[in-house]
Amino acid sequence: MVKRNQRKKSAPKKRLTKAEVEKQRAIKRMILSVLMALLLIFAMLRLGVFGVTTYNMIRFLVGSLAYPFMFAWLIYLFCFKWLRQKDGMIAGVVIAFLGLLVEWHAFLFAMPRMLDQDIFLGTARLITRDLLALRVTEFVGGGMLGALLYKPIAFLFSNIGSYFIGFLFILLGLFLMTPWDIYDVSHFVKEAVDKLAVAYQENKEKRFIKREEHRLQTEKEALEKQAQEEEKRLAELTVDPETGEIVEDSQSQVSYDLAEDMTKEPEILAYDSHLKDDEASLFDQEDLAYAHEKIGAYDSLSALASSEDEMDMDEPVEVDFTPKTHLLYKLPTIDLFAPDKPKNQSKEKNLVRKNIKVLEDTFQSFGIDVKVERAEIGPSVTKYEIKPAVGVRVNRISNLADDLALALAAKDVRIEAPIPGKSLIGIEVPNSEIATVSFRELWEQSDANPENLLEVPLGKAVNGNARSFNLARMPHLLVAGSTGSGKSVAVNGIISSILMKARPDQVKFMMIDPKMVELSVYNDIPHLLIPVVTNPRKASKALQKVVDEMENRYELFSKIGVRNIAGYNTKVEEFNASSEQKQIPLPLIVVIVDELADLMMVASKEVEDAIIRLGQKARAAGIHMILATQRPSVDVISGLIKANVPSRMAFAVSSGTDSRTILDENGAEKLLGRGDMLFKPIDENHPVRLQGSFISDDDVERIVNFIKDQAEADYDDAFDPGEVSDNDPGFSGNGGAAEGDPLFEEAKALVLETQKASASMIQRRLSVGFNRATRLMDELEEAGVIGPAEGTKPRKVLQTN
């Protein structure tokens, strides 16, 4: 017995490993799959009694979809692993197949012979008949499974509705078989809707432009027709040889009146909508009489000058030309600009009610008792005016800007503590959507005096009121902000506002555009002294020409005995009223520099000297400057420039340092961009937040074309800077390093290639010492390649390779 037990213990049963177990399972699964496949093949081929019976049993389950069902089953048996790897493939096939079952059964019970039969009994009777007779002859729809699905669907949605439900099942199954998810589909639908909306808006704008072009063409044709009739009338006039008076016969007068009546078309009212129907002519009789009177006066002046020498004879010709050109000049109207789009800020009102409660709760959590007095919804921000309790220090509220931004889930929060003229503190919170302020809307709502030629609407305040500024009182303006913040749009708005109010003989422009693309659209308008200057080296000479004009005007004022341009022009008007010899008033001059930093890189000393001299003395001479730059650093906006350009306009900047350079205080770094600005005029101690107006390129082109159609450019050679060369000794710009370190060009190339700048990198890559590397960094900063040091932050590379 002992030996027998020992023999049993010495031969224990061997346990299979996990791999062996898995292998056995795979073998069993393969055998089962092969047997199942043979069974399905017999059924598909209907071989003998066994095949027909098996096929009818499958038909009993899925009806006439037996073949697709068996084919899908075969694929599942041999491609199981592949199907498991495809997310949603099996579920999609099952759901789509269920939809087909519903469709097939709905088709079955739409047949006349099945209309009055019970769904389950009728389906079972058809299948059982074939099963017992060992045949396959009847169409049985979706089998018993189809009957099970079809009965509740048909009860709820009828037979026709069953088709629609089955189709939805099929679509859902196909969608699950695709690699897309519901987010992809919704995103695709959203993009398609957005594209349709954009296409609709573009078509709408194109239709508007087409209508405007047709209107302008009609008005132009009417004006040409009127001019032809005027020429015809003048040709038919006869002059009395004895008295020299014009004798008009009644026939010519009648024909002229008829021609004038024919030109009174309704479209002309678009230029002067305030005129009555009987005043709808583009140039009324008073204007024509005044023009004839002036032309006669200047003709007599030319005859008087013909008795003098040849050089003097040229002057009356110029004087004669200018008044006759501008007497019939018509100012552009606001109809040239695209109409304003309606705005809906009802969403903001609901958000404001919620934010008032959040603000009070947040202050309460910090132990500060405040009350929100009012909230003003502006185009870009909402201003909450809060009243702190007695004894609450203002700086406690000012220090909570970041906490308030967190509580309100806002991009940034600007605190105005206190609001000038009020015992309240303002908290400016960005709106969920910035409402665009169009130039046309701002112009129609502004109360700018049309007599003040340089008073232009600038933007809308937080309370929605239009704010205007008079450049003559500024007297110069500095516009600064990062790229894309809205500087160029603001400059275009200022130029367009002046063009809307001033004739070419009243205001002249000198435009300097080193970028070559911002102001070039204004070329060839009659308001320009010279074509738009795009060469930075020419720009410094052009500014010097303006300085010379300023000095000449002061000498003229001294001789006449007046203090400013207004006094001089008054003297001219008095002289013209009492004398036959006419003098032309001096026009105002507006100098616009679109990128000051580029000029300072090429000729910093000359440009800075000219700007400082103009800033100190040009106001009384009627010369004003608008300086724009996207690089508000101290090497561009020097202390002397800031002292002589007291009015500032700051758009969004990247840091508080840039904001302090522009405004002498923080705040611009919290702006939102897209025209959001802080405006600090000369007569205010604190900046005002405004949303600048948007003027499109199409609007600018329309007003420019309107002006060009009336008068041609008449450039003044006295302001022409002439030709300049790169070797001109008069320039002392910082654009190169001829007298600097020999490795300057290598260091510059390294910085431009890597777009990084540090003394340690120059040490390592150029194998130089620390002192030499720091000197190279200083030279790169002076050359405008890199920005100034900002503490521990890396220096910004201002140029690209």
From Swiss-Prot:
Membrane-topology annotation of the record: Multi-pass membrane protein
Region feature (Disordered):
720-739
Q: Output the Gene3D superfamilies linked to this UniProt entry.
A: 3.30.980.40, P-loop containing nucleotide triphosphate hydrolases (3.40.50.300), Winged helix-like DNA-binding domain superfamily/Winged helix DNA-binding domain (1.10.10.10)
Q: Name one GO molecular function term.
A: ATP hydrolysis activity
Q: Which residues cross the membrane?
A: 31-53, 58-80, 89-111, 131-150, 155-177
Q: Which domain of life is it from?
A: Bacteria
A single GO CC term, please?
plasma membrane
Sequence ranges assigned to domain FtsK in this UniProt record: 464-660
Free-text domain note: Consists of an N-terminal domain, which is sufficient for the localization to the septal ring and is required for cell division, followed by a linker domain, and a C-terminal domain, which forms the translocation motor involved in chromosome segregation. The C-terminal domain can be further subdivided into alpha, beta and gamma subdomains. The alpha and beta subdomains form the DNA pump, and the gamma subdomain is a regulatory subdomain.
Q: How does it assemble?
A: Homohexamer. Forms a ring that surrounds DNA.
Instruction: Tell me, in a sentence or two, what this protein's role is.
Output: Essential cell division protein that coordinates cell division and chromosome segregation. The N-terminus is involved in assembly of the cell-division machinery. The C-terminus functions as a DNA motor that moves dsDNA in an ATP-dependent manner towards the difSL recombination site, which is located within the replication terminus region. Required for activation of the XerS recombinase, allowing activation of chromosome unlinking by recombination.
Q: Which family does it belong to?
A: Belongs to the FtsK/SpoIIIE/SftA family.
Q: What is this protein called?
A: DNA translocase FtsK
Q: Which source organism does the UniProt entry give?
A: Streptococcus pyogenes serotype M18 (strain MGAS8232)
